[in-house]
Amino acid sequence: MASSSRSASASPDLLKWSFFALMGLCVLTVLWVDERFWINPADPHWKHVAPVKYLLMLHGLAGVTALATGTLQMSSRIRRERTALHRTLGKVYIGAVTVSAPVAVYMGTSTLEPVSIRFEQIFQGGFWLLSAWIAYVCIRSGQMQLHKAWMIRSYAFTLVFVLSRLPDVYYSSYTDQGIADLLWAMVVIGAISPELIMTATTLLKIRNAKARARRAAGAGDLAPV
């Protein structure tokens, strides 16, 4: 019974870290395919980003910081055993988002980007910043469950930083409308992600509890009288 209980509790952790491993692979892929121009001065993409290269660098460094610290924020072990570290990482995450999100909105609504995505960029960057700060206000008010939900939502918007670039692995070019549709879809998914994740987690716990109850009942029936 103890081993089955441990395996049931380990199941969500396995899913969580498998997800983060997949995201790590996505990050490496995006860095190689889409961000390689940083180490290649002859890359023609430099001409496109030249007017905002320092802002882009600031946005990128802050975004990577949010991505890394946000991942560690999801560690239940750090939350349990290293509370001070968890809080420090949370503050670094908030600071990184506070820097990166407004810069993203500024660049995303400039003439460097297609008209079709400029309005979306306000929502994407705005929700990213808003959800991070709501998560912070919730934890300062002692509302742990609300903090968790808003932190998941904020981190989902952080992942857009990576996932929106994945199509570049397969397509060298696509329409402005295609980019807009993809980004709006990610905004919607990011907005509802806490409900999806927390609902799935709750249903998994219920299923595991019922399975343990059935095994316990079966063991009781087989016990010697």
Residues covered by each model-derived region:
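Alpha-helical membrane insertion/targeting regions
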Residues: A2-V225
